[in-house]
Amino acid sequence: MTESTTSDVVLTSEQIAGLLPHRYPFALVDRVIAHDPGVSATAIKNVTMNEPQFQGHFPERPLMPGVLIVEAMAQVGGLIVTQMPDLPKGLFVFAGIDGVRFRRPVVPGDQLVIRCELLSLKRKRFGKVKAEATVDGDLACSGELMFSLVD
């Protein structure tokens, strides 16, 4: 995947809320900095200490749970397909996760840069994205995420 060279906001948090169904505390994309509908997206997730998961994961050494990193990547993947013309209306949900690996801890104060690229879309109902999340240029998580349309 190519590195984004822009820090301009392409989609604000308000615009993202108009495209994705997720709401607090599960809205995990703060802004989109690059977006090619139907092809790829790059977004930012600012990790802050006042997020609810850090009360229990772990109070003495807060770490962002891996499942939330994967969910943030999936939400960025969802932004790719929400802007595609000719897709049926409905909700895209997880259908599978392949090859996900965690390479470094993500902690409060980090900024996740999440890049997703659409690998395939079959029958306008089943899709696969390649996703990676980095912090300060270091790979934190990567994998392939599958989704399907729920009528």
From Swiss-Prot:
Gene3D superfamilies: Hotdog Thioesterase
Any one GO BP annotation for this protein: fatty acid biosynthetic process
Disulfide bonds listed in the record: none
Active site per database record: 57
GO cellular component: a single term: cytoplasm
Highest taxon of source: Bacteria
Keyword field: Cytoplasm, Lipid A biosynthesis, Lipid biosynthesis, Lipid metabolism, Lyase
EC code(s) of this entry: 4.2.1.59
Pfam families named among the record's database cross-references: FabA
UniProt cross-references to CDD domains, sorted A to Z: FabZ
A molecular-function term among this protein's GO annotations: (3R)-hydroxyacyl-[acyl-carrier-protein] dehydratase activity
Reactions accelerated catalytically: a (3R)-hydroxyacyl-[ACP] = a (2E)-enoyl-[ACP] + H2O
UniProt-annotated location(s): Cytoplasm
Matching InterPro entries: FabA_FabZ (IPR013114), FabZ (IPR010084), HotDog_dom_sf (IPR029069)
Function as written in the Swiss-Prot or TrEMBL entry: Involved in unsaturated fatty acids biosynthesis. Catalyzes the dehydration of short chain beta-hydroxyacyl-ACPs and long chain saturated and unsaturated beta-hydroxyacyl-ACPs.
PANTHER family with a match to the protein in the record: 3-HYDROXYACYL-[ACYL-CARRIER-PROTEIN] DEHYDRATASE (PTHR30272:SF1)
Family the entry assigns: Belongs to the thioester dehydratase family. FabZ subfamily.
Protein name, per record: 3-hydroxyacyl-[acyl-carrier-protein] dehydratase FabZ
Organism: Synechococcus sp. (strain CC9605)
Gene designation per UniProt: fabZ
